[in-house]
Design a protein with these regions (language model features):
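Outer-membrane beta-barrel proteins and related beta-barrel translocases across Gram-negative bacteria
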Residues: 2-458
């Protein structure tokens, strides 16, 4: 019979994939598998090691006791990472600047470029060093941090003394100083900025000061714009905001707040925030008495809860996306549906921790995994699915409606069943019983010996 194969349960099994074109080999229960699809190859010894290669996008991923140690490569870019703390990376940027980074977080940082030495830096934290294009800053220089450091972001330079207690800032029409939390002042003049479309925009100025932060604050924002804003605070006595688009007043913060948002067209009362909130208007309708109940919605969002966190519901509707998520006690139960309002197609995921996870993709493919202690908390995490999910997947079931294929596996193929329009295969108890049917050709095996065989001609 064409296509005859032997199955040995969780000792060894080789089969076609159900949800996509390709083949998979599993052996030693959950501790080895390899998989080949049209573009991607996977090889793994869960949970110790896994390797994925996708030649079509020049991508490779190595995991060693994930997430203990990982290596990612995308084209010429590569990165080693150890528990998100120690990392080494390098490769060729789109600007053709060959750069290599080394990090032993948080003590050592370095970068070397083969083509532009201006990109080089070295830092030995907290003693001395310079960083470039790190931590959302163009440049960071420090000496015996926190005694002294200097940061630059675009045209704004900040000199810090005994960070975060003292600083002097200047640049881009702005200057100021702070001795935190005692006193501070900063102001900026109105400036012009050219956006990405070549249009000149006005960047508003401001005047800000504080003393005994955050008890006493004074801010005038948006100077020179169509929405100048005045904010004053003497906490906990009062805070207020006044602007053409919004008025807000708080008395005995955070107990009593009234808000009139003319831009978004709603009024809101908070008594106190965030526990008791009522809002009414075209832009927002909210009724919340936390943790008893809460209902909130506007044109695109809906959020409800009852006896939080026992039941929560959240919906986002913005064509062509409609996303709904229902949760019971955080991740104990979760049902997420993402639907295209244009085509009507949808994908869905249902998790019940730690018992199962089930998902359906936009093509209608379905997959059920029984026992899932990590997947509900970190859904769609390839590292978890590749290195840890095989260890506790006691039952797997997959269905492909387009091809008509389906498969079920119990205890790492101790029992396995595959069906397709012209194919059926059943294997039980290490393959001691096997049945296979391809078209009209049938075969039955006991103890790996053929005991019955028929062909279509018969």
């Amino acid at each position: 019979m064409a296509g005859e194969t032997n199955s040995f349960g969780f000792i060894f099994d080789h089969f076609n994939l159900t949800l996509e074109a390709g083949q998979r080999t599993e052996a030693a229960g959950p501790f080895y598998y390899s998989q080949q699809t049209e573009d991607e190859s996977t090889f793994a010894f869960p949970p110790f090691y896994s390797y994925v290669s996708n030649l079509s996008v020049e991508y490779t991923d190595y995991d060693f006791l994930y997430p203990l140690l990982t290596r990612l490569q995308y084209g010429q870019e590569w990165r080693w990472q150890f528990f998100q703390l120690f990392s080494f990376s390098g490769g060729q940027e789109p600007t053709d600047a060959d750069k290599t980074r080394h990090t032993i977080f948080p003590f050592y940082f370095s970068q070397r470029s083969k083509t532009d030495t201006n990109l080089d830096y070295t830092a030995f934290f907290p003693f001395y060093g310079t960083l470039k294009n790190r931590l959302s800053r163009d440049r960071i220089h420090f000496v015996l941090f926190p005694i002294y450091s200097e940061t630059r972001k675009r045209d704004v330079v900040t000199d810090n003394y005994l960070f975060p207690f003292g600083d002097v800032r200047h640049g881009d029409g702005m200057h100021g100083w702070h001795i935190w939390p005692l006193v501070g002042t900063e102001q900026k003049i109105v400036t012009l900025h050219t956006n990405g479309f070549g249009d000149v925009e006005t960047v508003g100025g401001y005047k800000r000061s504080f003393w005994l932060w955050p008890l006493h604050l004074k801010q005038d924002n948006g100077i020179g714009t169509d929405n100048p804003e005045k904010f004053r605070a003497s906490i906990p006595l009062y805070t207020y905001t006044r602007s053409p688009k919004l008025d807000s007043t708080t008395v005995l913060w955070p107990f009593f707040t009234w808000l009139d948002n003319r831009e978004k067209k709603y009024r809101e009362w908070q008594m106190p925030w965030p526990f008791i909130i009522f809002a009414r208007g075209e832009g927002k309708t909210t009724s919340r008495v936390f943790p008893l109940f809460g209902q909130s919605h506007n044109a695109t969002l809906e959020s409800d809860f009852y006896l939080w966190p026992i039941y929560t519901f959240r919906r986002t509707h913005s064509d062509p996306l409609d996303l709904r998520r229902t949760r019971v006690v955080f991740y104990l139960y979760e049902n997420t549906v993402e639907k295209s309002t244009q085509t009507g197609s949808y994908k869905q995921r249902v998790d019940m921790w730690p018992f199962f996870t089930w998902h359906r993709d936009f093509n209608g493919n379905e997959r059920l995994q029984v026992f899932a202690p990590l997947e509900p908390a970190v859904p769609e995490n390839p590292g978890i699915e590749r290195n840890w999910s095989p260890l506790w997947s006691l039952w797997r079931a997959e269905t492909n409606p387009k091809s008509g294929a389906a498969s079920q596996s119990l205890l790492w193929n101790l029992y396995r069943r595959e069906t397709a329009p012209a194919h059926k295969k059943v294997s039980l108890l290490f393959g001691l019983f096997q049945y296979q049917c391809d078209g009209g050709n049938q075969r039955t095996k006991l103890f790996y010996l053929t005991v019955a065989k028929t062909t279509a001609a018969q």
